[in-house]
Amino acid sequence: MRILAMTRAHNAGRTLAATLDSLAVFSDDIYVIDDRSTDDTAEILANHPAVTNVVRARPDLPPTPWLIPESAGLELLYRMADFCRPDWVMMVDADWLVETDIDLRAVLARTPDDIVALMCPMVSRWDDPEYPDLIPVMGTAEALRGPLWRWYPGLRAGGKLMHNPHWPANITDHGRIGQLPGVRLVHSGWSTLAERILRVEHYLRLDPDYRFNFGVAYDRSLLFGYALDEVDLLKADYRRRIRGEFDPLEPGGRLPIDREPRAIGRGYGPHAGGFHPGVDFATDPGTPVYAVASGAVSAIDEVDGLVSLTIARCELDVVYVFRPGDEGRLVLGDRIAAGAQLGTIGAQGESADGYLHFEVRTQDGHVNPVRYLANMGLRPWPPPGRLRAVSGSYPPATPCTITAEDR
């Protein structure tokens, strides 16, 4: 079995040697594109014994962020792989480390033939002396990535300007995607809040409408659910939570779903298709839905097999939208205790997942539901190390095409 590792570098001297060392543990060849680096990247590549092929762009070309668009760079790497014809390809960024708790070669050798690509967790390194516990106090910094796939002739890259998956756009023509426990990608970039803010500003200059980020706002995805103009609020919430100052939580109060692993399929805030006034949790069908807070059922709507329950308490409305997986029904005026079960989630159409749209409203409009939960000491994000893949296209097929008219 032959494993080819590939990466693309531009002034990556700070992290490149460690990345190459981590790839050399299990790969037979390492191919690299050096995109006009002016630091010690070229020297590192020349002296690393595991690097077997380097393509260099002319250093005197214009100093654009990348010489060629991301999709063209991926296409070049795929064509380089055609000359190696490996059994498996691993592609990483030059600031990713690969950590393994398994014999990766042995695992790949016994991977079923119908699995053609593998996902594993990526975690972000955090080293911010001013906000040392921002992770996990404000959320996790984990995601699933797909760095491994089988080589086939004719693989092609996605056509977006940026944020294409590393694996080929047509890889699923050859089989299905699996998960790879025991392997982690460690992202060495964006290890402080200031670096994340700079990255958001950079992406917004290139893609102000988030068209290349699956329609997801860059600030909400990189700043723990907060908007770029809410950084001061993020910092204030962090300091409150560090001091243990939380909003009151009723006896019995809990997350609306607590079966693990869960995932956030679609977050709160602006998206390319409009403003999303809640958060969509993906979970297993059959998962119970619980009332976060007590109140009275003030509205029940059913549309296309979905039920929308609104539980009102004082000046707060909490909305739960899901496809029921049981026959239980509430009626208008029912008094609901905090922690009471409201129903169970059914499967959503073509997806193997079920979804809960969770929304919080006050007299002033919609509020960030993740912040609402977290400021009561509840942690709605996926637990560390307990990531789940969301089936279906991304963003996932959600039952909630709700948009806010006023916010």
Swiss-Prot record:
SUPFAM superfamilies hit by this protein: Duplicated hybrid motif, Nucleotide-diphospho-sugar transferases
Keyword set, alphabetical order: Signal
Keyword Signal: yes
The keyword ATP-binding is annotated on this UniProt entry: no
Top-rank taxon, per record: Bacteria
GO MF annotations in UniProt: metalloendopeptidase activity
Membrane-crossing residue ranges in chain numbering: none
Signal peptide annotation: 1-27
Pfam families: Glyco_tranf_2_4, Peptidase_M23
Name used for this protein in its record: Uncharacterized protein MT3894
